[in-house]
Amino acid sequence: MAVHLTRIYTRTGDDGTTGLSDMSRVAKTDARLVAYADCDEANAAIGAALALGHPDTQITDVLRQIQNDLFDAGADLSTPIVENPKHPPLRIAQSYIDRLEGWCDAYNAGLPALKSFVLPGGSPLSALLHVARTVVRRAERSAWAAVDAHPEGVSVLPAKYLNRLSDLLFILSRVANPDGDVLWRPGGDRTAS
């Protein structure tokens, strides 16, 4: 799939509408647009985390793959489901979710069991991965809202992908804290120093 952008602004959205992949026009507040915009924001958050660098090139490669997947999720969410499409649309497949689950299992196997909730923080990379995780959680909620608003026209697989992705980002945020997790100490268990 080749993308050619010769001009960034078109003025076609100045009336509060935008075009979906099938060239139909919808309000910029349409649930599908909100969902793929949230995917875009999640991608930017992952990009910010990647900009810090990571000594493990495998994790960098995983995050780059996820960035590409998020573009695929956006393409899926912006392409209404129709019978017999003229061109086969780009869709999130179960294999994307399976790949995330494989990474979840592999990276989680090397981490200690949790004894409390984890606070976002620790290393800068870990903190940014937590930011990305929370944006992905919002994108997931937006994707489910799009499914609810357009039950026959939006696939559930992008929402499922985003659900699993937030799990992986949580795991990777823990991996990115080599000195250990920053754990929540409930109520009376904490004192300011």
UniProtKB/Swiss-Prot annotation:
UniProt subcellular location: Cytoplasm
Annotated pathway: Cofactor biosynthesis; adenosylcobalamin biosynthesis; adenosylcobalamin from cob(II)yrinate a,c-diamide: step 2/7
Gene Ontology cellular-component terms listed: cytoplasm
Keywords, comma-separated and alphabetical: ATP-binding, Cobalamin biosynthesis, Cytoplasm, Nucleotide-binding, Porphyrin biosynthesis, Transferase
Major location category of this protein: cytoplasm
Residues engaged in binding ATP: 10-18, 28, 137-142, 163
Top enzyme class: transferase
Gene Ontology molecular function: ATP binding; corrinoid adenosyltransferase activity
Keyword Protein biosynthesis: no
Signal sequence segment: none
Catalysis performed (reactions): 2 cob(II)yrinate a,c diamide + reduced [electron-transfer flavoprotein] + 2 ATP = 2 adenosylcob(III)yrinate a,c-diamide + 2 triphosphate + oxidized [electron-transfer flavoprotein] + 3 H(+); 2 cob(II)alamin + reduced [electron-transfer flavoprotein] + 2 ATP = 2 adenosylcob(III)alamin + 2 triphosphate + oxidized [electron-transfer flavoprotein] + 3 H(+)
One Pfam entry name: Cob_adeno_trans
GO biological process: cobalamin biosynthetic process; porphyrin-containing compound biosynthetic process
Enzyme Commission number: 2.5.1.17
Protein origin, superkingdom: Bacteria
Family classification: Belongs to the Cob(I)alamin adenosyltransferase family.
Protein name, entry field: Corrinoid adenosyltransferase
